[in-house]
């Protein structure tokens, strides 16, 4: 499920433009969103949720010593989402559904939301390179990537955006 930021708090994007798209209209996940999932300090990232007092150091290890790249597509900073047959998801695909619901803000104000959702079965691939350092080791990074699947990626987590990891050497 996607809810891409439009650039300011007043801009309301059309539903299908809330997805992350490349210049060809292929849906995908920006590499920066993976960094955020693993190490953000202002949202429930893996480092914050699973690593307690060590979370800051682990997050710093990800940000300072880990390189993440998409392994498919033309832009190493954007990982195309593929369907179960390996075809890229395009924003024009009729299988993409618009989900409508009401979010409740802390003061109880109803906030109607409308977000595009790609059905389960999507795949994307990333390459993770970790430099030797004292803050983060390979085993912890692998665990963090897998724990990210519990939190989920995108919005309305962890109900949506959960994933599992398949390691490729």
Model-derived segments and spans:
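RNA-interacting cores
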Residues: 1-169
């Amino acid at each position: 499920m996607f809810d891409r930021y439009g650039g300011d708090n007043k801009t309301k994007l059309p539903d299908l433009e809330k997805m992350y798209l490349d210049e060809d209209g292929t849906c995908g996940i920006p590499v920066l969103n993976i960094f955020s999932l693993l190490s953000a300090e202002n949202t429930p990232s893996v480092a914050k949720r699973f690593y307690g007092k060590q979370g800051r150091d682990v997050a710093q290890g990800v940000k300072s010593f880990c390189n993440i790249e998409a392994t498919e597509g033309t832009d190493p900073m954007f990982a195309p989402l593929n369907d179960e047959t390996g075809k890229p998801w395009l924003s024009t695909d009729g299988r993409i559904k618009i989900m409508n619901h009401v979010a409740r803000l802390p003061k109880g104000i109803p906030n109607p939301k409308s977000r595009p959702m790609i059905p389960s079965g999507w795949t994307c691939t990333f390459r993770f390179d970790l430099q030797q350092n004292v803050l983060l080791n390979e085993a912890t990074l692998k665990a963090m990537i897998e724990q990210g699947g519990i939190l989920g990626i995108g919005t309305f987590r962890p109900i949506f955006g959960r994933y599992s990891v398949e390691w490729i050497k």
